[in-house]
UniProtKB/Swiss-Prot annotation:
It holds the Pfam family adh_short. InterPro entries: Fungal_SecMetab_SDRs (IPR051468), NAD(P)-bd_dom_sf (IPR036291), SDR_fam (IPR002347). GO terms for molecular function: oxidoreductase activity. PANTHER family: NADB-LER2 (PTHR43544:SF7), SHORT-CHAIN DEHYDROGENASE/REDUCTASE (PTHR43544). This is Short-chain dehydrogenase srdF. One of its GO terms (cellular component) is cytoplasm. Short-chain dehydrogenase; part of the gene cluster that mediates the biosynthesis of sordarial, a salicylic aldehyde structurally related to the phytotoxin pyriculol. The most interesting aspect of this pathway is formation of an aromatic product from the highly reducing polyketide synthase srdA. SrdA synthesizes a reduced polyketide chain from one molecule of acetyl-CoA and five molecules of malonyl-CoA. The polyketide chain is then reductively released as an aldehyde. NADP(+) binds at residues 18, 37, 67, 95, 167, 171, 199, 201. Induction: Expression is up-regulated during sexual development. Expression is also up-regulated during confrontation with the arthropod fungivore Drosophila melanogaster. Keywords: NADP, Oxidoreductase. The active site is at residues 167, 171. Its EC number is 1.1.1.-. Belongs to the short-chain dehydrogenases/reductases (SDR) family.
Length: 254
């Protein structure tokens, strides 16, 4: 099967955690080309991803380098994608992000705010801009921004999200940008934001401990990844511009 007949999925941040889990699920499907961005191709977690069980017919993994704080990496990654003969993207998942600061709102400083904003909001925006020409050639293209309920302005008080002002504020900015993409590109692309659940990653476990949920977050990486893929599979034009909890499929207030 030619590349033009394959479903091409781009996932940022596949080096570990949810991104790696999502990549493995798409790679298990026939005729899926999975393009994953990583910061460092030499890490053990990336080696594990590359050593995943042999993909079915017509499926393969392509890794590209993107550092979330770089203003040039996304465009360079697109050139690397084109060099492999790939001329379209059907699904783009802006998953890469970080929670580098856990300083409360009473103490958070400018450096923490700017670092989070650059990684979690500007990075996905630059990725969207770089991938746009390839998305326009996709079949019923979809864009999903991996956000968090901590970025929901409507849930700041119920979730006590003010314990993560830099992270939550940056994700709120990502939500605004996602809504902007959904509105401006609604004629041809379905765009959503999604909350992947409180997942058993380093940041997820920290939050679980902070709010008294125990040592580990309630959602495994595998279950989160499966929920994200299921949600994206079921998207329709009517889904455009919405913010979903991937775990249960419900809408999250912006």
């Amino acid at each position: 099967m030619a590349v033009t007949d394959s479903t091409v999925v781009f996932i940022s941040g596949v080096g570990k955690g949810i991104g790696a889990g999502i990549a493995k699920l798409y790679l298990s499907r026939p005729h899926h080309i999975v393009i994953g961005s990583v910061r460092d191709v030499s890490t053990p977690s990336v080696a594990e991803l590359k050593a995943s069980p042999t993909a079915p017919p017509g499926s393969k993994l392509l890794l590209v380098h993107i550092e979330s704080t770089s203003s040039t990496d996304p465009a360079a990654a697109v050139e690397a994608i084109r060099a492999q003969g790939i001329d379209h993207i059907d699904i783009a998942i802006a998953n890469a992000g970080a929670m580098p600061s856990t300083v409360p709102i009473e103490e958070v400083d400018t450096k923490d705010m700017l670092e989070n904003y650059h990684i979690n909001a500007i990075g996905p925006l630059l990725l969207f801009q770089a991938l746009l020409p390839l998305l326009k050639k996709g079949t019923e293209p979809k864009w999903a921004s991996v956000s968090t309920t901590a970025g929901s302005i409507g849930l700041v008080d119920p979730l006590a999200a003010w314990i993560l002002p830099a992270y939550g504020g940056a994700k709120a900015a990502l939500n605004w940008l996602t809504a902007g993409i959904a509105s401006s590109q609604k004629e041809w692309m379905t765009t959503i934001a999604l909350h992947p659940g409180l997942v058993q990653t380093g940041p997820g476990n920290w939050v679980a401990q902070k709010v008294g949920m125990g040592d580990k977050a309630p959602v495994t990486v595998g279950d989160s990844a499966a929920s994200v893929v299921k949600l994206i599979d079921g998207l329709t034009k009517e889904s455009n511009g919405k913010f979903y909890n991937a775990v249960d499929g419900t809408e999250v207030p912006w």
